[in-house]
Amino acid sequence: MDSRRDFLKKAALLSGGASLWDMLPDSIQKALEINPPQGSTYLDAEHIVVLMQENRSFDHCFGTLRGVRGYNDPRAITLPNKNLVWLQKNAAGDTYAPFRLDIKDTKATWMSALPHSWENQVDARNDGKYDRWLDVKKSGNKEYAPMPLTMGYYNRADIPFYYAFADAFTVCDQHFCSSLTGTTPNRLYLWTGTVREKPSIESKANVRNSDVDYDDLAHWTTFPERLEDNNISWKIYQNELSLPMGFKNEEEDWLANFTDNPIEWFSQYHVRFSTGFQKFLAAQAKELPTEIADLEQ
């Protein structure tokens, strides 16, 4: 089996030929050329990179990966009808098992996101019965709504890059949402470990995406602040803020942040007053007289 560094080198080469390797920054090339000393552990790491992706379950991506608690889980829960949880029944009485979403020969990549908010997550769980996935996780696309897409998964042939990562690095199974909700609450957990202002049941649980944003700022302590308290530096890398920054047309489609970083909505970071947003507002103000004149013609 390739070492992790060998894997990363090959991935860079296979992704776009030898030229891609040459395009990597010198610092990255240098880092990939360094072999870790024997006997080193994670305690010797100087940098930790955290990337959060969403809208896909562990089984959806790695349910067929060898050695994990996936679709061959010997301890899968049993539904009230005595079937294993993999055999889901809808309101019409039809039963569906997990099936492969063939990326090459189907339109699986265009199926769009299935419902994944507080209400339908709780409804699918159904008081711990886990038996309403087909009814409450239907596609919002009318063409796809009758399809049991929530039971679909990818395998190694569909997402070889992810499986190569899984082969080269440690994979943790038993993945689940920190909060049985949607994007913002789970990203709040990533940044803070909670969805509440105070660790008390009297404190509101922010379980909906709209509960925390620029109009409803959060104030509790975040992990970056805790890092600073321990003299550990940190950085956030993203193309733009969730505020308008001037991207246009396809730039917005490919480079926008899509409100996926709720750290922006904590009052202590003052992101609303960022330099980039102020420049955008100034540019818009200069264009406003021309836009008004065009409308008056």
Q: Which sequence ranges carry the predicted segments?
A:
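N-terminal pro-sequences and low-complexity stem/linker regions of secreted or lumenal proteins
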Residues: 2-297
